[in-house]
């Protein structure tokens, strides 16, 4: 008997609310753009060194999701949620040294790992207690909440810094998010839900490496364009003559669009399965990138940037459900941990490669053509993927 069969609706709602609070708070690690200039002034380092703090965080987000299935078996959700709440505070004590290495360890390692653990654990818990016919929407909500956390704290951090200064404002921000995670812990404990797990030996025989490779490549290529556009939105807008305020508005709309699209994509998955919506999203994405390569209007540019970022949000919202459908719920945490490394790899390669191509050509034409080609290959990989829902 699985957890889905013994959990009632009240318990599901409490668990979902807890996981949404956790992912909302852990998504704030991606509000790093509001910290970067203050970190540079505090530590007296340049842009490349300060950017390495966020790169370290991305690596540790990916690592936490990758090893998460081991932690889910060894520790109770309550213990893990406690550590999710406390690790950023430990990191805060280290980053308060006001040194570059302190930020690498405190923010990059401790907060980054906590963020990935919170995201992965929430996906695992929600997929364990949600009926299959509602799984896409539930996981879409979790992914969207992660994005919304970045949006809200991108606005909250500057407010706190203006009124309290950078150091005290950052302390206040982390105390707020840690407190919210503890509220999530209380909600989960109140639900009294017990997660039932199958033995890993009975699961191992169902692994299909070819399927996992296709899932990995589909994810890597599917998010490549979105990560490149998100990472270079400000310089792309600047190259078209856009102002700083235009860039800030675009970034906010892109992140909001990503979250909203994730919710809608989850709703579509519950009605049409994963493959058809995913193919449709990738086709629209390819068309948007093609339009991006030929247009010259700043207003159209903003629309296309928001569209591509929103489609990226839809892809990352669909993928946990896609993995669960293809390999089964018992294997989904372990397999998704492996597949999620595609996101981490794309997150490190895509913006860096786009920056290198820009320096070589002094424009983004080569980067856009590359992402267009990659998006077409992503469509072909998903098209050839055998898809059926496995119980």
Regions found by a protein language model. Give the residues of each.
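Hydrophobic core of transmembrane alpha-helices in multi-pass small-molecule transporters
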Residues: 102-117, 300-314
């Amino acid at each position: 008997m699985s957890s889905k069969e013994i959990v009632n609706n009240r318990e599901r709602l409490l668990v979902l609310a807890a996981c949404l609070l956790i992912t909302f708070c852990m998504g704030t690690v991606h509000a790093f753009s509001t910290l970067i200039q203050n970190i540079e002034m505090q530590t007296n380092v340049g842009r490349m060194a300060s950017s390495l703090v966020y790169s370290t965080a991305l690596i540790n987000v990916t690592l936490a999701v990758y090893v998460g299935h081991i932690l889910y078996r060894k520790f109770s959700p309550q213990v893990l949620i406690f550590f999710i709440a406390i690790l950023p505070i430990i990191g805060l004590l280290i980053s308060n040294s006001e040194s570059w290495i302190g930020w690498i360890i405190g923010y990059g390692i401790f907060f980054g790992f906590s963020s990935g653990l919170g995201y992965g654990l929430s996906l695992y818990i929600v997929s364990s207690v949600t009926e299959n016919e509602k799984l896409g929407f539930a996981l879409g909500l979790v992914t969207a909440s992660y994005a919304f956390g970045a949006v809200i704290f991108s606005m909250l951090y500057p407010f706190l810094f203006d009124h309290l200064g950078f150091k005290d404002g950052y302390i206040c921000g982390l105390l707020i998010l840690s407190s919210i995670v503890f509220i999530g812990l209380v909600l989960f404990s109140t639900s009294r839900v017990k997660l039932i797990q199958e033995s890993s030996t009975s699961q191992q025989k169902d692994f299909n490496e070819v399927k996992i490779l296709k899932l990995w490549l589909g994810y890597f290529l599917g998010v490549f364009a979105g990560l490149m556009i998100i990472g270079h939105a400000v310089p792309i807008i600047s190259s078209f003559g856009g102002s700083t305020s235009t860039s800030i508005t675009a970034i906010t709309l892109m992140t909001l669009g990503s979250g909203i699209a994730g919710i809608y994509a989850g709703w579509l998955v519950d009605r049409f399965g994963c493959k058809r919506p995913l193919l449709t999203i990738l086709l629209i994405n390819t068309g948007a990138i093609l339009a991006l390569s030929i247009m010259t209007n700043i207003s159209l540019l903003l629309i296309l940037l928001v569209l591509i970022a929103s489609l990226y949000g839809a892809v990352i919202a669909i993928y946990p459900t896609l993995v669960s459908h293809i390999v089964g719920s018992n294997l989904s945490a372990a397999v998704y941990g492996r597949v999620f490394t595609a996101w981490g790899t794309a997150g490190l390669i895509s913006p860096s490669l786009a920056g290198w191509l820009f320096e070589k050509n002094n424009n983004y034409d080569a980067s856009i053509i590359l992402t267009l080609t990659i998006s077409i290959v992503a469509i072909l990989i998903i098209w050839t993927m055998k898809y059926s829902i496995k119980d």
